Amino acid sequence: MYSLSISTSGKYISVAIHDDKLISTSSVLSENGTTNLLMKSIDEITKKSRIEKSDISVVYLDIGPGYYTSLRIGLAVEQGVCGSLGIPLVPVNGLDALAFAAHTGHRKICTIIDIKREEYAFCLYKPVPVSYTHLTLPTKRIV
């Protein structure tokens, strides 16, 4: 079975299909029409990967921080997709996902996300075996 990972938290709609390894990704600039672009991106990536939507067993969704309206649209669309397929929707904190991707096992990590209008969210992490732990709680700052 396959997993679908989605982010609508920023300027781009990003979609990925993976199992034990990454199979396919797509990233599209979202100026307007996030709902249509998200559904189109999911359709295109499943076709490109030759995977039926019914073969997807879980959806991981970036729940922010990020662009408020885009996050709400992503959540609404994916609740519908997961409900129709009868599969779980797993929320993923965007700052934590960035820290996990950058994890080296020996360095502190600071993740920063632009959340619009000169506002940024950030969090500091310290390494622990195989993962990381928060040094600070996620924080929002206006520049």
Features from the language model and the residues they span:
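DPxDG-like acidic metal-binding loop motif
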Residues: 58-89
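Short glycine-aspartate micro-motif
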Residues: 3-5, 60-62, 70, 109-112
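Stable alpha-helical structural segments in soluble proteins, enriched in small hydrophobic residues
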Residues: 45-49, 84, 102
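Short, well-ordered secondary-structure micro-motifs
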Residues: 16, 101-103, 121-124
